[in-house]
């Protein structure tokens, strides 16, 4: 008997929480509705049957009911639509958790507003307490600060409103930070502090630090912002909850340090980790890298959600700070071609040593020169003697001649479509129209060349919102719907390609396509449900779509929809 739930939304959620906890399920769960499998045939089905955390049937409703037998719970989706669980293909897990509790500077349209936010925080903070924030981007401000050096603000205004509290404000790109005088005093950062390799300490005309740190120079501020293991655990759990609300079932954590890894392993051991995590060990830490290279990867089993089987190196910076490494100088700053942040010989060495235990090597490269150098390293190393699935994280700006090399060398292009929506309006200033047209965000060219792609958001550089990422992939517009026809529309992805790029292709990029990524018999029962059908809704309505249910291993970990269901048992019918 199908019973609709009534009452306030909170009452609905409270009651559903009681009824749909794993212990209240029959051993078998049947879910019916519009379901896209994202398998090789782009199949759409009516129902799935889940038992012991895996799909045991995928197909039409009548056959599903027969397969489920007389003792099962039936969850009907109604007007909602289901897909394989969305996989975040590239993000920063603990940084997301921190961003939730720190000053959120995303979307703030002026430096003066940021100064005001810091002033408010300083008024509430205890003396010496570090004020942290993230998300500012000078190219997105409506007006330029009154004082700038190299196009960036200085610490002066922050130091005036927060003289007794160190301030650390991370750039949206994660490659630049702004600190105030109290922070520099705590760090003993002065005019004669040596610039680290692969980093930049921006200084004014007198030689004094302005508070802006680029690339490896950001590490100088690490003592101010380093998390304890307990703090990292808190951040990861906050990020996990946030991810569930956006329909994320799996998360590729791009560059975890020792503290993050320790926290992840502790949460996994305690059972508090529900999100599936694919961890990339930070190759920026030589000691950590050498430790893990000498050991086999950690692969999640039935009682685990954590896999550690890859490394992440960082070859260059970001376009916004003009630290992405280019073959030719920046169009709007001919005095620089960006920054190399990792030694290519060290990268080749890591790649060669990775063969002993089958580690995957993933390397951040945004600029075309950085991408060329990483491809060269893969070509020099012995990786291609095995199924290495090396990834270039971002693969954002490429020489046309390098596109075919991705396919030839078996390299995965790990893109973040949402970066195109956010950055394309001003990226043309950095690169000029010719480089934009020939090599920027060239997803279609990569696919046509036979390159495997993965797709993520780079959260918290961008919000984790997979709906916005889907829209960016298929529309190639800003989130305001501009321009009307989209940017370089020949590079668009289809909706089926986009769905796969967020599910099956991301699973492939983590060697997990046999376990997750599509709704297929035998795979883990991970699903994301949205209130609208992403595959058919008008393009201009995609961004209004909301995730309403997240299922991991057959367990509903997030629910924001009213559902109808029945519980069928032999010789017994119950109303709920």
Cite the ranges covered by each PLM segment.
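Single conserved hydrophobic/aromatic residue that forms the stacking wall/gate
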Residues: 1-14, 565-568, 572-576
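Acidic (Asp/Glu)-rich catalytic clusters
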Residues: 268, 298-302, 407
């Amino acid at each position: 008997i199908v019973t609709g739930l009534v009452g306030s939304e909170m009452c609905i959620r409270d009651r559903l929480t009681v009824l749909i906890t794993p212990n209240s399920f029959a051993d078998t769960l049947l879910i019916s509705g519009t379901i896209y499998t994202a398998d090789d045939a782009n199949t759409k089905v009516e129902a799935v049957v889940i038992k012991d955390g895996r799909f045991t049937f995928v197909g039409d409703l009548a056959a599903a009911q027969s397969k489920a037998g007389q003792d099962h719970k039936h969850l009907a989706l109604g007007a909602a639509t289901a897909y394989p669980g969305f996989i975040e293909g590239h993000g920063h897990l603990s940084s997301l958790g921190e961003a939730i509790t720190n000053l959120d500077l995303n979307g703030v349209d002026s430096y003066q507003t940021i100064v005001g936010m810091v002033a408010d925080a300083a008024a509430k903070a205890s003396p010496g307490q570090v004020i942290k924030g993230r998300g500012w981007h000078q190219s997105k401000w409506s007006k330029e600060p009154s004082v700038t050096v190299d196009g960036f603000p200085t610490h002066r205004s922050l130091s005036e409103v927060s003289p007794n509290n160190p301030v650390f404000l991370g750039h949206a790109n994660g490659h630049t930070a702004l600190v105030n005088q109290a922070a520099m005093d705590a760090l003993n950062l002065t005019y004669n502090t040596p610039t680290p390799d692969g980093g930049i300490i921006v200084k004014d005309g007198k030689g004094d630090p302005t508070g802006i740190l680029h690339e490896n120079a950001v590490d100088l501020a690490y003592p101010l912002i380093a998390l304890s293991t307990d703090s990292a655990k808190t951040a990861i759990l906050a990020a996990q909850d946030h991810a569930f609300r956006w329909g994320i079932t799996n998360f590729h954590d791009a560059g975890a340090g020792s503290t993050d890894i320790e926290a992840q392993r502790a949460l996994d051991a305690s059972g508090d980790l529900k999100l599936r995590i694919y961890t990339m060990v930070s190759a920026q830490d030589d000691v950590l890298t050498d430790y893990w290279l000498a050991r086999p990867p950690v692969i999640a089993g039935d009682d685990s959600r954590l896999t550690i089987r890859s490394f992440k190196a960082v070859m260059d910076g970001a376009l916004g700070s003009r630290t992405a490494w280019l073959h030719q100088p920046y169009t709007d700053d001919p005095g620089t071609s960006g920054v190399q942040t990792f030694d290519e010989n060290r990268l080749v060495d890591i790649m060669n040593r990775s063969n002993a235990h089958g580690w995957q090597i993933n390397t951040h490269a945004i600029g075309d020169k950085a991408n060329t150098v990483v491809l060269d390293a893969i070509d020099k190393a012995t990786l291609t003697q095995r199924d290495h699935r090396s990834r270039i994280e971002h693969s954002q700006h490429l020489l046309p001649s390098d596109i075919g090399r991705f396919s030839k060398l078996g390299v995965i292009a790990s893109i973040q479509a949402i970066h195109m929506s956010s950055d394309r309006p001003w990226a043309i200033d950095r690169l000029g129209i010719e480089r934009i047209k020939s090599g920027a965000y060239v997803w279609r060219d990569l696919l046509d060349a036979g390159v495997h792609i993965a797709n993520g958001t780079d959260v918290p550089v961008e919000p984790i919102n997979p709906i916005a990422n889907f829209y960016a992939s298929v529309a190639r517009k800003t989130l305001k719907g501009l321009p009307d026809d989209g940017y370089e529309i020949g590079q668009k992805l289809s909706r089926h390609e986009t769905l796969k790029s967020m599910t099956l292709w991301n699973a492939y990029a983590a060697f997990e396509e046999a376990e997750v990524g599509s709704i297929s018999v035998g795979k883990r029962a991970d699903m994301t449900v949205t209130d609208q059908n992403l595959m058919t809704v008008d393009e201009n309505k995609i961004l209004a779509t909301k995730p309403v249910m997240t299922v991991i291993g057959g367990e509903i970990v997030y629910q924001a929809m009213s559902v109808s269901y029945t519980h069928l048992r032999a010789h017994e019918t119950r109303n709920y």
